[in-house]
Amino acid sequence: MTAHDRRVAVLMGGWTSEAAVSRVSASFCSKAARLAGWDSVEVELNRNVLDKLDDIQPDRVFNALHGQIGEDGSVQGLLNILNIPYTHSGVLASATAMDKISSRLIFSSVGINVPPLLSLQEDTYVQPADYTGDYVVKPRNDGSSVGVVIVKEGMPAPQRSQWAANTQLIAEEYITGRELTVSVLDGRALCVTEIHVPGQFYDFDAKYKVGGSQHTVPADVPEEVTELSCGWAERAFAILGCRGVARADFIWDEDEDQLYMLEINTQPGMTATSLTPEQAAFCGISGEELVNHLLEIAQCDE
């Protein structure tokens, strides 16, 4: 690649609930790209994005978007049409990973344990049918723990009005345990991190606010849990056809010695508090090296 082929557009923002976080990721990635010798330009995702890309004429796109549009295959499809190589996963892997029902069916089919889904009743309130234990309600297609509600036994069911009318919801059994995560780079697991949060779970604030969570790298868990987490993360990455980097999230019920995969995130956070850059650094890969590598292997769907 010559110096004339090193212009990169870092896509960020948009209009979803995760737009602000995306801009922080973009700042981190754009700076890293410049340090690696790329001519980096941050581009806001809006109705004028095609004109902006036409003006810039990038040789690569670094996808720093989070949530719907940027993570569900939509932007990936646009970049395929424009024939601009982009980082991270393609259309099918992105769309499938974002859909919590489709992805879990696939994970289960290859021997990955996932929390049981519950039949959901929606009216004024949202609650599972014929189930009285603790449960979780969450959007079917969203990330960064946006819109997640935990309902403990004896608590009132959440009102449907808490979510937008067009938001598809799912419910699952609430499983307590230790929160683990594994980043996968080029199909190989980096390491296991344990996440310690002051609240009930690893929510939006815990993920992105400084001091919102504490991380233990590598996680102090039995070797067999480390091996299983890494193995399942690599298996999920492969079966969905992911590219570049992704991050798989788990709950380990230590009392029952059961591991559950919650999801695989094809657009993991790339901020100062994010898990994937932290795991890469633990493995000797700097933020600059990680971003540069993702740009070097950027591609469109074949």
Where are these regions (language model features)?
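Hydrophobic beta-strand scaffold residues
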Residues: S40, P85-Y86, V114, Y135, ...
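C-terminal active-site "lid" helix and adjoining low-complexity regulatory extension at the edge
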Residues: Q258-E302
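ATP-binding N-terminal substructure of ATP-dependent carboxylate-amine bond-forming enzymes
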Residues: M1-L92, T96-M98, S102, S109, ...
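Active-site nucleotide/adenylate-binding loops and adjacent lid/helix of ATP-dependent enzymes
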Residues: M1-M12, L53, T96-G177, C230
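Phosphate-binding site of ATP-dependent enzymes
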Residues: E153-G231, L259-Y260
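Short beta-strand-to-turn element immediately C-terminal to the catalytic PLP-Schiff-base lysine
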Residues: L118-L120, V148-G154, V184-D186, D253, ...
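Conserved metal-phosphate-binding beta-hairpin within the catalytic cores
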Residues: E173, F237-M270, A280
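A long amphipathic alpha-helix within ATP-dependent nucleotide-binding catalytic cores
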Residues: A164-Q168, V210-D255, E289, L294-A298
